[in-house]
Each structure stands twice: as C-alpha cells, then as structure tokens.
Amino acid sequence: MSAPAIKTGKTRPQPRFHAKPGEVKMPPGKKILMDLSTLHEPISELFKYPLSPGEWTDYALSSEQLQNFEENGFLPGIRILGPAQLEQLKAELDKVLDPEHPDNSLFYEFHLNEAEEEGRVLFHALGAWQLEPALHDLPWSPALQMAAYQLLGGAVRLFHDQLFVKPPEHGGVVAWHQDYSYWTWTEPMAHLSCWIPLDDASVENGCLQYIPGSHRWGLLPITGLTGDMNAASAALDDRQRKALETPFAAEVPAGVGVFHHPLTLHGSTENLSTRPRRAIVINLVRDGVRSNADILEDKETHNFPILPQGTTLSGQYYPLLFHPDSELGERRTEIPLAEDNAAPSPDQV
C-alpha cells in the first residue's frame, strides 16, 4: 500500500524532504551516515542462511498452504522472526521513529501521524531498510524468500518496506484497501506482501484483517488509507459489502507473518488495548515487473525511487532477493508453486 500519487484526482501525503531517484537531499545540518540500499546482501547476523538447496527446502510451503492462499488471497501462520530477532528489530524501530535520526531523509515517506481521526495516532513510513542493519536484512529472511518464490512463481525482488505503529489506547485505523490500487504504476501485477507483527497481534490491538476471496473482485478505486474504515464499501456491490461483515482477523503471535495477494481487501481497526501494535510490511515483486510511471502525477516531487516508463524494476532500490536457479538448482522441481489463476491479470481488471 501507499506509493506515489496516481492520476486519479487524489493525492498522497508527501515526505518532508524531497529528492529525485538516485539523489539524496538532506535537511540543513544533517549528514547521511550510510545508505544501506547500496548493499544487496545481508550485513548482520539476523538470520542463519541456508548453505545448500536441501536446507532451503526446509522452509518450503506445503501444497495445502499454497491452495489456501489461492482460495482466500492470504496465508497466515508463517514464522519469520524469533525472540532475539524481534528484540533487535524493535530496538531499531525505536531509533528510526525519531525524526532526528541522522538518516531520516532516506525514507521514501515518513508520517509521524497519518491518522485522520481526532485523538488517534498512526505512524507510517516507507524505506526503513536503508537505515539500520536488521531492518535492512529483514527482506533476506529465508522463510520469507522461499514463501515469496512459491507464491510469486519466480525470482523475487524487494519492492519496498513499510513500518506501522499503533500506540496503546489510541492507535488509528487503516481502512479497507487493495495494495495494487496504489501500485498500478508498475506492471504486470506480480506483487506480494508479508505483514509481520513485532507484537502479539489481536483484534483488540488492531491486527490486520482480510476479506477472504476478495482478490477475485478485480481492481477497486482508491477510497483512502486512513479515516473511515469502511470507505471502500461505496465501491462495492451488495454481495461484496456483505462480505465486509465477516472479515478474517489475523491474530498471530509476534514474528509470525501473513502473506497476501495485491488485490486482497485488507485493513485494521483501532488499537484500544494497553499494548502497542508495531508491524513491518515487506512488499515484493516477481523479477521482470516494469515501471508504468507515465500514469503518475509529479514524479519528481517525492523520494520514492521511480524508474522511467518501461524500465524493469532493478538496481539500487529494487535488489534481487532470491533466484531459484542459484539457490535451488535442480531441486527447484521439488518445490510446489502457487497456481497463477487465482486472480485476474492486470489487463482483465
């Protein structure tokens, strides 16, 4: 979700400091310590990495899990992080929440409070993988990479990450939306997201919720990311509005990820609990996805690394995370892949 503004008449909030792709513009008096987007391999000991194709297969999803994803448009219950990894990421999250972080200007977007409701707070930022070692290495999680390969059906690249923080008792909502409605500046639609809570997630503290089967509804218009939780209902038919009444709540322990399709309708309610609800989203694309930047407004006025029309997403800001030929070799034939007919293709929606 979230990205540069598309020519729809709506605008997206812009970061406080603007730069063209490949350029860093710093606020006065600040210096960049290190732009980690230049490093396309793990730089910490956050994960133990497989050393052979056999070790990679230990992370493989089952055929039943793939079928569940195809039917519902999401797949919960994939362990990404353990206790020590969670603590390291929470410590780094606390650091980058500070607007005075020396590398703050590297964020693609940085919103201390994107909530529209009075008295609510929703921290939201994109591009944290460039700032701190563990945040940088999270997309290289072996469990995440293997699942992404199976669900996307090919080599995997990082699209962008997101941070969401809902503070206790007054955390704001994220309204029902589809991610790809914000991403039509890339094509074809071969995208995937993994939502990873850093705290135990429940309905009470605003866990992510999904509408099963909504990835088959086609592309819906943008109706807003915050504010009215049910704003998207205006774009739905009666059957679809009825489905909003019975969402699936992804109540998962900290560190357990939920993967979802780019057309799956999802959102999260307020955090009314006494606990924080912190989460990281890793958004991915299959290798070969291209820029469709001509549909964007004001391409030069934000920090998001937009590539020229028709250019394949690659280079500094879109690192290759996993390639089956190099990691699996001949054993790739043993790994089941998701069927590619669970949702309409971009030219059908």
Predicted regions and their residues:
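Non-heme Fe(II)-dependent double-stranded beta-helix
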Residues: 12-72, 78-176, 182-185, 223, ...
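Short, conserved beta-strand element in jelly-roll/cupin
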Residues: 184-203, 251-252, 283-286
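N-terminal acidic, proline/glycine-rich, low-complexity intrinsically disordered segments
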Residues: 1-8
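Conserved hydrophobic/aromatic beta-strand scaffold that supports enzyme active sites
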Residues: 58, 74-76, 193-197, 247-249, ...
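Short, surface-exposed loop/helix-turn segments at secondary-structure junctions
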Residues: 178-179, 228-244, 274-276, 294-302
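Non-heme Fe(II)/2-oxoglutarate
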Residues: 3, 13, 17, 23-55, ...
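Double-stranded beta-helix
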Residues: 49, 201-265, 289
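Short helix-to-loop capping/linker segments positioned immediately adjacent to catalytic or ligand/cofactor-binding
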Residues: 133, 146-147, 181-184, 196-199, ...
